[in-house]
Amino acid sequence: GPLDQLLGRNQLVLDMANADVRDYLFGKISTVLSNHDVSYIKWDHNRVLPHVDAAQTYGTYSLFERLRDAHPNVEIESCSSGGGRIDFGIMNYTQRVWLSDSNDAAERLRMQHEASHFLPMAVTGSHVGPRECHTSGRIHDIGFRAWVAAQRHMGFEMDPRELTDAERAKLKQVTQWWKDNRDWRHKADIKRLAPADPAIIAEIQVAPEQDRFVAFIGSAETSAWSCPASVKLTGLNPNAMYDVTLVNRDEKTAASRGTNALDTGTLRLSGGFLMAHGVDLPNHFPDRMWVLEGAAA
């Protein structure tokens, strides 16, 4: 666009349709990658274009392709939705995408749910943000922040020095769980669940062999239901028996009164039962997440 264009976030837009611009960027970026041990770069795009221009996108594809050919071991993460950089075309040249500059776990829960129509877990970056989110000012429990990030390609975007001992222990627990389960989850199908309670946002990730699953049941707001409804799962082998465990039962709050079979142990249930009847979970505060995993018995 012209030099007198309106600024966005105090920035102009590089004309990626211009081969000279692409050559300049390739030379500068490639020099850095050649001279330093860099394994990952993030391509930020945080302002709208001054006008619609498909050549801008194709030019970006061309630059990424050259960088990938010259540096095949360097991973590229494309950012962000605000710049329209998440599309199926860009996935030919990048390993991950970044949904938004907001790391507010409540907003991320919804974003990731909607993006799951198109993007698998392995390519969707999601980070544990600071105690107070820089884009919303909200303060969320470390468990909620960590489990929302663990739904996707997990990372951290925070100062760990702010963590209490209890928060540090919880973050370590969730991170270890993510590492222990990432291999099979990278190949899993994400299926959105449809809980009867509109306050709940939930999904299930099922291994291709249907022998493992994990369900994330998030409380997006205060529920109007005095008694939580069963959450029906999907995508399972109806004839298989699954050992079902509430991974984070230690996060049970005062919102849950009475006892629940998942509070202390593992249930063995058929896939048919889990899909037809569902699972009864303890009640929860808003901005909390239950994590339910199952393995074929």
Label every model-predicted segment:
Residues 134-146, 205-210:
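Structural motif
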Residues 195-238:
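Carbohydrate-binding surface patches
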Residues 44, 76, 149, 215-217, ...:
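Hydrophobic, well-ordered secondary-structure elements that form the walls
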Residues 1-141, 153-158, 162:
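Active-site neighborhood of glycoside hydrolase catalytic domains
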Residues 39, 72-74, 95, 147, ...:
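Structural beta-strand/beta-sheet cores of well-ordered domains, especially the beta-sheet scaffolds
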